[in-house]
Amino acid sequence: MMRISLKTRIVCLQLCLTLASTLQAADKFVSFIREEGTLELVTSQQRSFSILCADEEHKGVLTAVHNLQEDFYKVADIRPALVADAKQKGSADGQNVRILIGSFDESPFIKQLVKSKKLDARELKGKNEKFIITTVKDPVEGIPGEVLLIAGSDKRGTIYGVYELSRQIGVSPWYWWADVPVKKHKTLYVDAPTTVSKTPSVKYRGVFLNDEDWGLKPWAAKTFEKERGNIGPRTYAKICELLLRLKANHLAPAMHPVSTAFYKIPENKLVADTFAIVMGSSHCEPLLLNTASEWNSKTMGPWDYGKNKDKINEVLGNRVKENCAYENVYTLALRGLHDAAMGGGDVPMKEKVKMLESALKDQRNLIAEHIDRPVETIPQAFTPYKEVLEIYSNGLELPDDVTIIWPDDNFGYMKRLSGPHEQKRSGRAGVYYHVSYLGVPHSYLWYSTTPPALMYEELRKAYDTTADRIWLANCGDLKGAEMQVSLFLDMAYDIDSFNANNVVTYPARWLAKMFGDQYYSVFEDITSSHINLAFSRKPEYM
């Protein structure tokens, strides 16, 4: 076994820590020690303050602000008041406004700041999911003094800015799902030279909850949602919150027959809308329909497009109609029930291509019928997974605006990337990537061991060939894949902050953020050894 000298290890560690600080220091604006010129949020004398956020704000922003109030309580044992009017009693009378939060497209306070030229509209107007964090003096009438401003280009931009403040005061995105401890602080200060976030690298970034039979579903049924006995709105609320704290925006819900289908519980979609999550469905669920548990062959007839086309289209049309008021990415698909091929193996390939093209055309027509927008502007995705990839490769024609989501081989290696012709498509491309898998030849469900270096290599190749529209990670039932989910979503948010060198230290840095930099060298040794061993042979295969 090769031994690395202590001197070499120290130099490497210093390099890694320098890199880690470089990645984070640019946007660090919260401190726990008073410095000259800092804005006081919490001190021994200042034990209360207010957050100003207009009632007109998006529901998702108000939800995030309420969570921010609770985050301050976790850290400093104070719960800031929330006021919606600069002249509201309590805002300038005792409970001073110290934080102003608003979206460029909704907040009257942000519009006032732009009008008074205290905020540069060029950084926000027309931008996707960007935020600005800075300090402003006398921001609006009725609010004297200096405040911390969090302004977003749109609702999710504002939400990400809010949760960035939560992260910097010490609340991990995984505080609930992984019980990451929150360190208490008696003082909180802000020094915020203007921080402007990047536009996310990938437009829709999220996870697909899958194979929930052994973990997520029984846990929800027996502990968190006993009254429902299944995965329901309370569980999905916690998942939506986690995604937003990780700067994601997209969710494909659990779909095995063991759990109640997402849209069979009306509150579920209301929860997603309240959090501002864009819903979708997996590669085998057309137009948000969970065919595995929602299609009843006894009452609806066979799930066979060749034999039962009219009924299939009727059910799919109803699903679009029921959900057209919400943000969705619509999957275009025609597969058998529960991740199986449709039709017999003796069907000629030309007939398979013709049938799939016809089904996708019908689905597009249903979208156009029920949504009052040009169909070309509505997010749609097609995933050539398993046998569908062969059909696609045999000449399947897709509308140019549909996003092709390229799958991996279930083990982290991309099966295909966009070629020169596909790179010209207006719908661009996406990625469907496994960090958990149930199927042949081998499953891996205990916990995720996909190497970060492999993830970066494969996802970067995909991104560089126009896969920047949708990234969806199959994360199983979430638990056991926390690090890989974080890495996947961090790369989807800012792929250019990663390279082949710094991605290998990601697990150690990820753990150090939670438990302290003093343990970094220990984490680096453990994670690198663990990843190398598990790459040789996954624990599930022993």
Question: Model-derived features: where do they sit?
Answer:
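Substrate-binding groove of N-acetylhexosamine-processing glycoside hydrolases
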Residues: 193-197, 294, 334, 363-542
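Aromatic-residue-lined binding/catalytic grooves and analogous aromatic/hydrophobic interfacial grooves
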Residues: 48, 154, 169-171, 330-337, ...
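Extracytoplasmic/secreted proteins, especially bacterial periplasmic and envelope-associated proteins
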Residues: 60-63, 67, 71, 157-164, ...
